[in-house]
Regions:
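Generic cytosolic/nucleocytoplasmic N-terminal low-complexity/intrinsically disordered segments
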Residues: 1-2, 192
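Sec-dependent N-terminal signal peptides
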Residues: 3-15
Length: 223
């Protein structure tokens, strides 16, 4: 757990020039979500961030190893809180209390948020695809093209990014699709699949892409 404390402190001060994220996945002890969220509310509920923020998600379908994750996101050139923590020990106390409700820390990764189309906070149900791309430039171009073609019929958000550190089983990229809930996601996916020609072009032009996994999550807190 010392690694987590040091890494979170490192992320809060390190800067570079692209939008980015860092995530920490964990398996919560049964029945502890309310206690975990109370701790996080106390830690981040009144935080004033320089850019971006923090999302807490609970996994719903497909990610068997983890129950929740913490996502820190924003502009790494302007990262962290405007309001500083009262002292360094506050991090240690927070992690110690959090660990009382955590069975184990399961996975962490970091990377870039290369695009995020849409801005509707009502869409808190997310499907994540993790893949390995052999041609990142072609993959990004094909993604941008099909998102543009689907924009008139999409109500949620679509995100695209890369993994720079710790991509699951070698994943290089991720794609996120948001919806209001599970049923809304299924209906959205059905509408997307009706666009046969755009999808044909997408698969022909994105380069070799190897599927790794996909899963769904629900945003339970936004800070």
């Amino acid at each position: 757990m010392k690694k987590l404390v040091y890494l979170m402190l490192f992320v809060s001060t390190f800067s570079f020039s692209q939008n980015a994220f860092t995530e920490y996945q964990f398996e919560a002890k049964r029945g502890t979500e309310s206690a975990i969220l109370a701790l996080m509310d106390a830690m981040w509920g009144n935080a004033d961030f320089k850019s971006g923020g923090i999302d807490i998600e609970s996994f719903n379908i497909g990610n068997e190893n983890s129950t929740h994750r913490i996502i820190l996101y924003g502009d790494p050139a302007n990262w962290g809180r405007k309001d500083s923590l009262s002292n360094d020990d506050k991090w240690s106390v927070f992690i110690q209390k959090l660990n009382n409700h955590v069975e184990k820390w399961t996975h962490s990764s970091s990377g870039n948020v290369m695009s995020w189309d849409g801005d509707n906070k009502e869409y808190n149900y997310v499907q994540i695809y993790e893949v390995k791309s052999s041609d990142p430039v072609a993959f990004k171009a094909a993604h941008d093209k099909i998102v543009s073609e689907m924009s008139s019929s999409m109500k949620g958000e679509i995100g695209f990014g890369s993994y720079e550190i710790g991509g699951y089983n070698g994943s290089t990229h991720w794609v996120a699709i948001t919806a209001k809930n599970w049923s809304d996601l299924i209906l959205t996916r059905r509408e997307m699949k009706k666009m046969i020609k755009p999808w044909k072009s997408y698969y022909e032009n994105r380069g070799d892409v190897e599927y790794v996994r996909n899963y769904t999550s629900k945003v339970v807190r936004r800070y």
